[in-house]
Amino acid sequence: MFYKMIERKCREWFQSEACTVHDLIDYIEKKGQMRDAQIGAIKIYLFLKIACGCRPLAELFQAGTFNAENLDEIELSTRTRQYLAANPAARALFEYSRLENDKGEQVSTNIEGKIKQNPESLDYEDFFQTAFYHISYTDYLFSLPMGAGKTYLMAAFIYLDLYFAQNEPSNPAFAHNFIILAPSGLKSSVIPSLKTIQRFDPSWVIPEPAASDLKRRLSFEVLDQTKTASKSNRTKNPNVQKIANHQPFKKLFGLVAVTNAEKVILDRVKEKDGQIDLFEDSDDEKD
């Protein structure tokens, strides 16, 4: 249900003069290669990235970013109305509690009633922190129906990020490199599917010549190699070698690394003379 508040504010942004990507969305729609569900997700993605600064959802809700209701049109006591007007997190939870699902059922008449009667009784910041798992980093989840083209949507996100990162290299909202985590139990079927990202035509979402330029700059690494034992008691990790080949990392742009979750769990990263150490210590050496 949080999505409804985000989507509502997203529509307002796209209808306003503050939106800076009207031409880009028009281009994507006229190109006619992306499906409606994919375009809808791209709109939300760009809204969160540009209008919301790619901030964590808990922070955005606490700041009242998605608040939209007119308090003067709701039956409230003067005290409650003033409290909600002065506390955006409280107002956000109040608006959330009044949302209705597809069956017309209200999210929570109980929360709405508590806020109306005694708005000071609830810890609004804690509610949103708990709702979004107390994480401090940005974490956006996009859920599409089966067959709607999730892999190509991922590719579109990657190219859109690179497009804006190339124009605004110091803007932290846009990534320069990417890591895709495939479910380990399904890596035999999922990772080959993710390789279709390489075949995605960026001109579906980005005009030329920028699309072709970014396509040339994109590099794709599948980190699926097993460790190899050397003559010593140290183990060489060929996946580390693949990443090390892209040094210097300060200038790295356009790398897409695909792996299963376990492969990114590291005890430490060692460097020697400014280069990544490609060997891992044995269990005895770690002790």
Indicate where each model-derived feature is located.
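RecA-like P-loop NTPase motor core of helicase/translocase proteins
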Residues: 1-287
